[in-house]
Amino acid sequence: MPPKEAPKKWKAPKGPKPTHRKNKNKLELGRAIKYARQKENAIEYLPDGEMRFTTDKHEANWVKLRSVTQESALDEFLSTAALADKDFTADRHSNVKIIRMDSGNDSATSQGFSMTNEQRGNLNAKQRALAKDLIVPRRPEWNEGMSKFQLDRQEKEAFLEWRRKLAHLQESNEDLLLTPFERNIEVWKQLWRVVERSDLVVQIVDARNPLLFRSVDLERYVKESDDRKANLLLVNKADLLTKKQRIAWAKYFISKNISFTFYSALRANQLLEKQKEMGEDYREQDFEEADKEGFDADEKVMEKVKILSIDQLEELFLSKAPNEPLLPPLPGQPPLINIGLVGYPNVGKSSTINSLVGAKKVSVSSTPGKTKHFQTIKLSDSVMLCDCPGLVFPNFAYNKGELVCNGVLPIDQLRDYIGPAGLVAERIPKYYIEAIYGIHIQTKSRDEGGNGDIPTAQELLVAYARARGYMTQGYGSADEPRASRYILKDYVNGKLLYVNPPPHLEDDTPYTREECEEFNKDLYVFDRLPDTRKEQVQNAAKAKGIDIVDLARDLNQLTFSAHTGGDTQKEAKSVTHGGKQAALYNAAEDLDRDFFKMNNVEGRLSTPFHKVQNSSAGKRHNKKNKSKNAKSKVFSIENN
């Protein structure tokens, strides 16, 4: 009997059914964005019960401590409004436009070109009259009963008032150039903490221009916070100065009753490395032997002129600080004398701390502003060092190029390089630049539009770039921006050395250009050259029969590196590198020479093209009525 239903067709099994599990990853992109918005836009209730809502981004602490020294007009307006807690509403039909108002500064002065002695004297007199208005922001008085919001609001109001005072100073004196200064309140808060905590505030300045890096109002602020606190001016990089220059600066500081000392963090760190290498054979007097010179001066001045060693600097700190710490110690901790180190970026605060501690405790960089936050380092059982981030204090300068040459503004972010390079060419003698780099700078006379013996910025940069082979795309174009970065970094690092003299002791007037040249003439001698360059110049001098080398007199005759010497009738020249791109030549003549070089002939057109008569030029398409006697183009082939 047949089955009631037909058997089902066999099918392959599909396998087990998938089990859907819930995703364990709760932090998806959507949820992450949602949580971030909730955290940023959180509602805060003030102590009086008022609701406070903000849309400010929640940023990390290191982002808030970024240094801000320059702002555009719009950024400055918005930051000032944010400090004042101003509200904004959008006005779609507003016709207000934002324009940039040029300051009244002379373009030559602001960009960094040379100034006459009379112009410099007039500006300096006005700067000294307004120096009392160059203030640093004070932290307002506070107590433990204040809430976080009240303290923050009070600090912002005081900081905003300080910004307004400096803005009024700049607007009312348009002929003065105010240096870029720190505009981030979070960075100034680090200074406030250092001043409150420290018993001795050490202001570190660059020995090449101490008055630019010194803030007089900071010393007043330290005394205002507590009269028992002490100030000390640490003149770092003193090894770059000759003893004659240190004597001049010591006399000036003593006449102004400024507590100061000379120090060299670089030399101290080098001696630490030498001490590790020599071990027990190391002699302490090695530090002093390099500094012994014969000078007759007052005993008090000579004692101050000496560059201190590490141990002597530690003893000086302890002698200048109060005998007992001003702040009470924390429970269970011994009392510590706190020594705060403050100053501009790139003056050597971190290097000074590393030399004192004897090991690399703080990161060091050639870029200004490496230290980002307030740090404490224990020097001994009774001394604590406080390292403050680099702060650019408000001050007066003659031009923007001076700020770049002093290392205040970073060179890698520089756009206008002509002004700073012009200052270097003006301050460093031409023969010494040629000896340092082994090049020859070709200058134009004043009749030809040049500066005579003083090269212009373009002449210096072109000579350096062509000697090094720094060229832009194309033929015969020197890469001047790249050359300027190398030269300016050598100037900031002290390879090209220039020291600003102190003002006159009688009336505080600045030195003239001729007096500055006399003050620095001992820096541009043969013995100051690097060892490798000194050996090259000495060998070249021996080949010419010169025993005692005078760079100003003999350099034009010597041949070394890329500098090819001349004689009394022939000027020296510089060897260029980089092939065709590093040589000046006419591209058209070079093309003709290469083309006709095959048959050793030149091709010249006897008649210009526009004078060749073509009778068929008026006929359309040149198809009919062709003249049988049409003149042909005649080329004359002449032997070379």
From Swiss-Prot:
Its EC number is 3.6.1.-. The keyword Aminoacyl-tRNA synthetase does not apply. GTP binds at residues 236-239, 343-350, 387-390. Residues 9-24, 618-631 have a biased composition (Basic residues). The gene is LSG1. The keyword Iron does not apply. GTPase required for the nuclear export of the 60S ribosomal subunit. Acts by mediating the release of NMD3 from the 60S ribosomal subunit after export into the cytoplasm. It is found in: Cytoplasm. In contrast to other GTP-binding proteins, this family is characterized by a circular permutation of the GTPase motifs described by a G4-G1-G3 pattern. Keywords: Cytoplasm, GTP-binding, Hydrolase, Nucleotide-binding, Phosphoprotein, Protein transport, Transport. It comes from the Eukaryota. Pfam families: MMR_HSR1. InterPro entries: G_CP_dom (IPR030378), GNL1-like (IPR043358), GTP-bd (IPR006073), P-loop_NTPase (IPR027417). Belongs to the TRAFAC class YlqF/YawG GTPase family. LSG1 subfamily. The lineage of its organism: Eukaryota, Fungi, Dikarya, Ascomycota, Saccharomycotina. The modification Phosphoserine is found at S103. Associates with the 60S ribosomal subunit. Interacts with ARB1. Present with 19400 molecules/cell in log phase SD medium. CDD domains: HSR1_MMR1. This is Large subunit GTPase 1. One of its GO terms (cellular component) is cytosol. GO terms for molecular function: GTP binding; GTPase activity; mRNA binding. It is an enzyme of class 3 (hydrolase). PANTHER family: LARGE SUBUNIT GTPASE 1 HOMOLOG, LARGE SUBUNIT GTPASE 1 HOMOLOG-RELATED. Residues 1-26, 607-640 are annotated as: Disordered.
